[in-house]
Amino acid sequence: MELSQLTAISPVDGRYAGKSVELRSIFSEYGLLKYRVEVEVRWLQMLSANTKIEEVPAFSDTSNALLDAIVANFSVDDAMRIKDIERTTNHDVKAVEYFLKEQVASNSELSAVNEFIHFACTSEDINNLSHGLMLTEARDTVLLPYCDKLIDALIALAKEYQHIPMMARTHGQPASPSTMGKEMANVAMRLKRQRAQIAKVEILGKINGAVGNYNAHLSAYADVDWHSESEKFVTSLGLSWNPYTTQIEPHDYIAELFDAVARFNTILIDFDRDVWGYIALGHFKQKTIAGEIGSSTMPHKVNPIDFENSEGNLGLANAIFNHLAAKLPISRWQRDLTDSTVLRNLGVGVGYAVIAYQATLKGISKLEVNEQSLLNELDNNWELLAEPIQTVMRRYGIEKPYEKLKELTRGKKVNAEIVAEFIDNLDMPEAAKADLKALTPASYIGDAIRLVDQL
């Protein structure tokens, strides 16, 4: 059976293929081979630039242009050729080396030094840098832009709903009012902080040989400062240098990165669930789309499917991220191979996250606040004013203010008249009474509006 969206085992490449297409060139087998080719080529070019490595003279402009073109024009056909070679070698990185030897065979200058392709490298020197490039591109071109879209969408909601009061709920029960805008601002600021954490994780790389000590490098060129060359090469790729490793770069930074992404996702799950609840309460309506069906048997249904889809896919993403973060920093002695198969799933976690981000954004775009529903709820809960009344009573030295309001309101239905009568009987200045009587559940929102202004 041929692979297609209908026959793919993973929904990332099946049902949701259109939502994850931007990740294919980064996390696919083609993507990994593309980065490996880039690392191998740049390493060869760096060797040629080192005057102490006389056996690899400085390359001519023509030869450097050929090498640059191999990187820039790397194609699916090139990747397929590498896979053909791998069928013989049964070694994926060695297949890249042999592919490059084929590519430079027609250039006498490069073919003369083709044994310096993959010089002194262990496979993990190439792989860790390839994964670093992969994660850098994914973070910079996919993850962070989606983070920004989500944060911007929530800030826009916060501004739009800035003046719309709502009854808050703690423990699921009525609590002091807020505004819908302020509640959106809370989420935006939480996401903003985690976005900054994601952005500042240093993506590390190493190129120091089979056990991290430059053994092979020094055996051939003892007078080369390989520490300096290693740092210069890794940073030239846009990565941060890790000078202390075993055979593998220990992947601690991958755990840091995915832990930060998982926290971002967890906040988004919290948001998805809250909006789901507000829709259930009638506080949000959803714009309907012609032709869409909400239920196979109940024609009236308009379900919060986007937020449900997001929640489910974020859970899958975090399950993968959590495993990667827990597993990858652990490798027996100087290395075992358990990280290899796990690292092939970097894109799976990111894929589920990206699918979820798109679902949340779609859900947000369909939201319409039901202001009347929010106002009705506030008007049905005048007991919310127990808090400001007992607080002002404390100011004026009235005995047992909390207890008196508890007696008036706890477990009871209170209306405007009952609240006004209670205030009239208080021993406090008339101006203070007037201020309290002017309060309504809808106006008792504290500094919620100004807090949105400060976003």
Predicted ranges, named:
Residues R42-L47, F99, Q103, A138, ...:
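Generic, well-ordered alpha-helical scaffold segments in large soluble proteins
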Residues E2-H217, Y221-K232, G294, F307, ...:
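A helix-coil-helix interface module used to build multimeric assemblies
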Residues M1-K34, T62, I85-T89, G282-F284, ...:
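Glycine-rich cofactor/substrate-binding loops
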